[in-house]
């Protein structure tokens, strides 16, 4: 069993789920012992000990409200520094408690509401994932007597505004953020959490019976896929830079048909076997386009211009002037399909490459 003291720890952070578990524990402890805690020590589901600071706590009658400030460590995200408020009401079992459990967990203002199938939580329920629920229940039950029960209400001030900057609206989670976290720990400087937040898009698409999924890098692809392909929101999967991760997930979930669609600046990299398209990982756009242009022309001056270009848009203009734009990008599109088909066997791929305005530069379908 490991122990992380977040009063001292600056590298690791703690999840929204850990905030909710810590806040609910401190509130119930206050109700039971009439003592305010500046921090609590709770267990995650692996048995690790997490020491989490409590920002504020108040009590009135059989109800206490605890506030925990979300801390993301070095892996700063949109939720870092936000307050999570947990209201705990303590009652006897013969009052308004469920017979099946002595811990009832509900969502308040700023916690999202599920509207689409395919996620870990069913439609009509608050966006509080199963693992955080289990962590809350496990820690509270250590304080409860057999004849006692609690209602835990989780709220996030400004959660609805914060959620607009996340994938929640696309996933059909409306009105607030999600309470997440398997271990309760946010690992530093990794993309793991963000990658995992992208994967549920595939579940939503499959739950809505889409057979062909459209994988796009981001907003530009999403916007133009709706126009050019008449695609529906839930059919479009935003992968960010993580093509390898998302295609692994797609194969794992049984997806058979994928259209790769998006701006040339990102899609071209796939032709070179670059499946994490972030610029800090690799670029090579100019080199890749130069190689495929050389199959259409041996004009050395054109090839040199391409290598020295600052943007993909500049290269597009060069190819238009030379009259070989479509030829080059159709070759690139074909190579994208070949690359992906070799790595992710069993999936039928097609590829459409566009510019910023949504004009099709090349395709292989």
From Swiss-Prot:
Instruction: Identify the keywords attached in UniProt to this record, alphabetized.
Output: Cobalamin biosynthesis, Methyltransferase, S-adenosyl-L-methionine, Transferase
Q: In which pathway does it act?
A: Cofactor biosynthesis; adenosylcobalamin biosynthesis; cob(II)yrinate a,c-diamide from sirohydrochlorin (anaerobic route): step 6/10
Which NCBIfam families does the UniProt record give? cbiD
Q: Give the E.C. number(s).
A: 2.1.1.195
Per the record, the gene is: cbiD
What SUPFAM superfamilies does its record include?
Answer: CbiD-like (SSF111342)
Q: Could you give a GO molecular-function term held by this entry?
A: cobalt-precorrin-5B C1-methyltransferase activity
Name a single GO biological process: methylation
Q: So what family is this one in? A: Belongs to the CbiD family.
Q: Which InterPro entries match?
A: CbiD, CbiD_sf
Q: What domain of life is recorded for the organism?
A: Archaea
Query: What is the name of this protein?
Result: Cobalt-precorrin-5B C(1)-methyltransferase
The UniProt catalytic activity note for this protein reads:
Co-precorrin-5B + S-adenosyl-L-methionine = Co-precorrin-6A + S-adenosyl-L-homocysteine
Q: What single Pfam family name could you report for this chain, choosing any that match?
A: CbiD
């Amino acid at each position: 069993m490991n122990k992380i003291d977040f009063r001292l720890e600056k590298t690791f952070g703690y999840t929204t789920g850990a905030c909710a578990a810590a806040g609910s524990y401190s509130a119930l402890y206050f109700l039971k012992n009439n003592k305010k805690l500046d921090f609590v020590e709770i267990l995650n589901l692996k048995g690790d000990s997490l020491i989490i600071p409590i920002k504020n706590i108040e009590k009135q009658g059989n109800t206490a409200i605890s506030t925990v400030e979300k801390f993301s460590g070095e892996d700063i995200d949109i939720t870092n520094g936000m307050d999570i408020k947990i209201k705990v009401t303590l009652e006897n079992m013969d009052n308004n408690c469920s017979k099946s459990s002595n811990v009832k967990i509900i969502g308040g203002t700023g916690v999202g509401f599920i509207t689409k199938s395919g996620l870990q939580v069913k439609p009509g329920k608050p966006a509080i994932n199963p693992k955080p629920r289990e962590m809350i229940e496990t820690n509270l039950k250590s304080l409860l007597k057999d004849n006692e029960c609690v209602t835990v209400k989780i709220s996030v001030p400004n959660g609805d505004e914060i959620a607009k900057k996340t994938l929640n609206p696309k996933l059909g989670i409306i009105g607030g953020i999600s309470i997440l976290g398997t271990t309760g720990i946010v690992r530093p400087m990794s993309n793991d959490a963000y990658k995992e937040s992208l994967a549920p898009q595939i579940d939503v698409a499959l739950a809505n019976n889409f057979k062909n999924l459209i994988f796009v890098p981001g907003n530009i692809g999403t916007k133009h896929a709706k126009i050019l392909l008449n695609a529906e929101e839930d059919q479009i999967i935003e992968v960010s830079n993580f093509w390898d991760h998302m295609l692994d997930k797609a194969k794992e979930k049984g997806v058979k048909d994928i259209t790769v669609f998006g701006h040339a600046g990102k899609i071209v990299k796939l032709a070179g076997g670059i499946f994490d398209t972030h610029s800090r990982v690799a670029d090579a756009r100019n080199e890749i386009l130069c190689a495929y242009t050389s199959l259409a022309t041996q004009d050395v001056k054109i090839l040199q211009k391409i290598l020295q270009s600052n943007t993909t848009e500049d290269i597009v203009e060069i190819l238009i002037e030379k009259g070989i734009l479509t030829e080059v990008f159709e070759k690139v599109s074909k190579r994208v399909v070949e690359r992906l088909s070799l790595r992710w066997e069993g999936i039928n791929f097609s590829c459409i490459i566009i510019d910023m305005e949504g004009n099709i530069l090349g395709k292989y379908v």
